[in-house]
């Protein structure tokens, strides 16, 4: 393994401020997707971007080597905003190695893991030792609720249906040097609730406490 080439790969990836929650950085999100597409293509993967108009694309890459099993690897190339910038001791979008540790936005969530996975596959390819088929599924809106993820995966169902097992490295560890296998994560639920009481406006001084107040109903509901 060429350490310098891995660091350069990591450094360039971290330098892209692919913040999916900020519209002004949408071009950077696209840049990160193209960066991964080019990297995986150079390793012999068949890569395509699945995208809705003005939305972060899904990077779908496949490499079939006639293996008995097909392994799917999930990741996300978008990152959280760097705010508050005053709390950073190193530049957020510049890879910094300090006291044996690597710093930068996305190092732990989730660009660092993507670099690890791609580098591992790259080494297996170089050694002619890749025994399983590989499919990368890397989205660009995990930090913004994965709004199009279900739609994208349905479009890719012909490829994804070939996967025997999926794994993701987007979680933490119990302790340093103790790998941890997660079997589930909590999800997210959001909704909009509207409450109507009656058809007409009523004077609060005359009808207060006599009829239901939507504000009170909402407070009791919550």
List PLM regions with ranges.
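N-terminal helical capping/dimerization or prosegment-like subdomains
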Residues: 1-85
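Predominant activation on well-ordered alpha-helical scaffold segments within soluble catalytic domains
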Residues: 11, 37, 115-118, 122, ...
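Beta-strand secondary-structure signal
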Residues: 11, 60, 135, 190-194
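Short connector loops/turns at beta-strand edges and beta->alpha or beta->beta junctions
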Residues: 12-15, 93-95, 196-200
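Active-site metal-coordination/substrate-binding segment of hydrolases
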Residues: 70-138
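Acidic/histidine-rich catalytic neighborhood of metal-dependent amide-processing enzymes
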Residues: 110-184
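Midchain, well-structured core segments that form catalytic/ion-binding scaffolds
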Residues: 150, 158-222
């Amino acid at each position: 393994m060429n350490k310098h080439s891995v660091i350069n790969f990591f450094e360039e990836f971290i330098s892209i401020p692919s913040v999916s929650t900020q519209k002004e950085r949408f071009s950077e999100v696209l840049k990160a997707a193209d960066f991964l597409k080019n990297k995986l293509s150079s390793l012999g993967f068949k890569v395509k971007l699945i995208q809705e108009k003005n939305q972060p694309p899904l990077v779908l890459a496949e490499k079939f080597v006639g293996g008995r099993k097909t392994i799917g690897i999930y990741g996300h190339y978008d990152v959280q905003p760097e705010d508050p910038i005053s709390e950073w001791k190193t530049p957020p979008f510049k890879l910094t190695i300090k006291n044996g540790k690597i710093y930068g936005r996305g190092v732990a969530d989730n660009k660092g893991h993507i670099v690890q996975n791609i580098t591992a596959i790259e080494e297996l390819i170089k050694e002619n030792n890749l025994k399983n088929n590989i499919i990368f599924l890397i989205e660009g809106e995990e930090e913004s609720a994965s709004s199009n993820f279900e739609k994208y995966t349905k479009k890719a169902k012909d490829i994804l249906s070939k996967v025997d097992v999926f794994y993701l490295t987007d979680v933490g560890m119990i302790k340093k040097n103790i790998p941890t296998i997660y079997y589930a994560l909590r999800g997210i639920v959001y909704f909009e609730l509207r409450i109507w009481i009656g058809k007409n406006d009523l004077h609060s001084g005359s009808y207060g406490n006599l009829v239901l107040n939507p504000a009170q109903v909402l407070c009791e509901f919550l």
